[in-house]
């Protein structure tokens, strides 16, 4: 096996010369002589043919070549480097197989981390980096959440249009493997629209709703209704379906599905998964009103058999959305607490009343402790006078 060429210890001119010779030897249409127009032109020529090393080279060898190109690229001033960086990023998306895609991912990650944090080019590198990460199933290695994403661009925030484009890509690369993360991305995307341009976000809004409904771990759907692009969907079937998941019970969904079966299926939603989610949401809503529920009530409200009640409640408890206790002997479920499906004015008033009651109870306790303390001091003084 041929040794891996390493050019990093050479001067820029020498690296360029060696790279030209290397690619020409591989059969690329490139001169082995340096350009008289400077390093930028050399890089353009080298990047233009660099994919030839994907044909027969070993991953470690290719990584060394790409590392050399990156080491030259990061020396180019920002005002002259944009086209070079974009051309390189585009080449990295052309890896013919997964092992080489991982090499390209490492190269782009190396470039991303070596660019100045205030460089606007980091956005373009990251966008292509996500594309390559999808090719080799490494998305979660480069994207773990919206907060992490924003922190990476804190010194040079991309434009709203750029972030919208990136959020759409992130949704696309996570929707099949991490619905919860994908749903959060879409909500963040819709949050980038204003009242002036929300009307053009129809497709994004529909994707956001569908992703949230399909996610088995997303139950608090009420915040979606306040997003401006979602408001523009009022009157559409997708908005009606969302409203059912926000505040209605299982029978409403069953009726909707019977009336609009083709629509639900066309959105890529799974009816059985929808039923499972609506049963849980219905149980949560019942738990808000009834501290105690019989098995008979649950079989009727949830449209399940009596032998399915206990397994269902156990699954609900695993979500930690509801705290409850099964009473098999009396065929009842005792509710301790539940998360509210919606959190509007009534819930805020309830929370206010609860906090006010706590405040009054604490005041009573403090007053009682003060009285006890005073009584003990008086008793101590009296006993001292007696003795």
Curated annotation (Swiss-Prot):
Name of the protein in its database record: Eukaryotic translation initiation factor 3 subunit M
Domain PCI, first and last residues per copy: 181-340
Keyword Protein biosynthesis: yes
UniProt cross-references to InterPro entries, sorted A to Z: ARM-type_fold, COPS7/eIF3m, eIF3m, eIF3m_C_helix, PCI_dom, WH_DNA-bd_sf
HAMAP family to which the protein is assigned, alphabetical: eIF3m
Gene Ontology molecular function terms on file: translation initiation factor activity
Species for this entry: Drosophila virilis
Gene Ontology BP term (one): formation of cytoplasmic translation initiation complex
Keywords for the protein's UniProt record, in alphabetical order: Cytoplasm, Golgi apparatus, Initiation factor, Protein biosynthesis
Gene Ontology CC entries for this record: eukaryotic 43S preinitiation complex; eukaryotic 48S preinitiation complex; eukaryotic translation initiation factor 3 complex, eIF3m; Golgi apparatus
Pfam families membership: eIF3m_C_helix, PCI
Localisation: Cytoplasm; Golgi apparatus
Entry similarity comment: Belongs to the eIF-3 subunit M family.
Keyword flag Cytoplasm: yes
Biological function: Component of the eukaryotic translation initiation factor 3 (eIF-3) complex, which is involved in protein synthesis of a specialized repertoire of mRNAs and, together with other initiation factors, stimulates binding of mRNA and methionyl-tRNAi to the 40S ribosome. The eIF-3 complex specifically targets and initiates translation of a subset of mRNAs involved in cell proliferation.
